Amino acid sequence: MSNTIACQFVFEPGEYDDEFHLLDAQIDLFASELSGFISVHRWVSPDSRLMNSIYFFKDMESVKALAKYPQHLVAKEGVKRWYKSYQILITEVTASYGDGNLIYP
């Protein structure tokens, strides 16, 4: 788990359109093809108000490549159209504990 970077996109969904769905698919594909990509996980809060997309990467270079991806830059311009609110959290995972039966990410 050393050097793992977790990029969380926590958001309250708004109204999605065709452009959103196209960009979302393109960004997911690009992220998954980066050499440092580990996985992506999505969660919904118990009250279904918030969603969290967590992308795990092996290195910060991959995070920076995703941030500079042209389709990602286009999507950032549409956040007010597609989301009621959002927050980005980028963290370095320094430790991971468990019983060994759950492999995450």
Regions found by a protein language model. Give the residues of each.
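Arginine/glycine-rich "motif VI" loop of SF2 helicases in the C-terminal RecA-like domain
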Residues: 78-81
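Short S/T/G/P-rich N-terminal loop/turn motif that feeds into the first structured element of a domain
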Residues: 1-51, 60-68, 84-105
